A protein has these predicted regions:
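One-face residue pattern on beta-strands with alternating periodicity enriched for small/polar residues
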Residues: 75-81, 152
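Eukaryotic non-globular, compositionally biased segments
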Residues: 23, 147-148
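Sec-dependent bacterial lipoprotein signal peptides
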Residues: 1-20
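Short, solvent-exposed beta-strand/turn "edge" segments of beta-rich domains on protein surfaces
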Residues: 54, 63-77, 86-92, 140-144
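Short, solvent-exposed, Trp/other aromatic-anchored flexible loops in extracytoplasmic proteins
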Residues: 114-147
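Extended low-complexity, serine/threonine- and proline-enriched intrinsically disordered segments
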Residues: 94-108, 151-155
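Post-signal-peptide N-terminal segment of Sec-exported extracytoplasmic proteins
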Residues: 38-71
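Bacterial Sec signal peptide processing site at the extreme N-terminus
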Residues: 18-35
Length: 156
C-alpha cells in the first residue's frame, strides 16, 4: 500500500514539474516577410557550352525574402533551375557554379559574391533535355539591405 502511494505521489510530482517548467533551450525568433530587391540574370552568363551539352539558367527564378529580427539579417531564398540540353550523351555528370552578386543600388560597388557548386548528374536514358531544381539562401546584414541592394545571377 505504501509503495502504491509512493508511486502515485512520484508520478504526480513528475507530471506537475514537467508541465510547469518551461524549456530553457527554447528560442523564439521573430521572422517577417520583406520586399525582395531587384534582380537580374547577367545576359552573357545565362548559358554555358560544355562541349556536348548546353547549360542554361532560365529566367523563371523565384525570390523570397525574410527578416530575422533577433539576428538583424535578411535571408533571401532563391528557387531556380538549371536546364541541360544534350547534343550527345558522352558524360553523366556536369559541374557548374551558380553565382550571386550583391551590389549596391547604383550597381557600382559589389557588396558580396556567393558561389554554389552544382553537380548535375544525368541518368542513362533517351532524353536530351533535363531540368534540375535548386534552392539556395543568402544572408545580408539588415543595415546593408536597407541602404539598397541588387542581385545579379550567373553560371560558369
Amino acid at each position: 500500500m505504501i509503495k502504491n502511494k509512493f508511486l502515485i505521489y512520484y508520478f504526480l510530482c513528475s507530471f506537475l514539474l514537467s508541465c510547469s517548467i518551461s524549456n530553457p533551450l527554447k528560442t523564439n525568433s521573430k521572422i517577417s516577410s520583406k520586399d525582395c530587391p531587384r534582380s537580374l540574370i547577367l545576359y552573357e552568363s545565362r548559358s554555358l557550352e560544355l562541349g556536348n551539352a548546353k547549360l542554361e539558367l532560365p529566367t523563371d527564378y523565384l525570390l523570397n525574402c525574410y527578416l530575422i529580427e533577433d539576428k538583424g539579417i535578411v535571408e533571401i531564398s532563391i528557387d531556380y533551375s538549371l536546364n541541360v540540353l544534350l547534343k550527345e550523351q558522352e558524360e553523366n555528370e556536369y559541374l557548374s557554379n551558380f553565382i550571386v552578386f550583391v551590389t549596391d543600388e547604383t550597381k557600382q560597388i559589389t557588396i558580396d559574391e556567393y558561389k554554389y557548386l552544382k553537380e548535375l548528374k544525368i541518368e542513362n536514358n533517351d532524353r536530351k533535355f533535363f531540368v534540375f531544381k535548386f534552392n539556395d539562401k543568402i544572408q545580408i546584414d539588415l543595415n546593408t539591405y536597407n541602404s539598397g541592394v541588387r542581385l545579379f545571377f550567373a553560371i560558369n
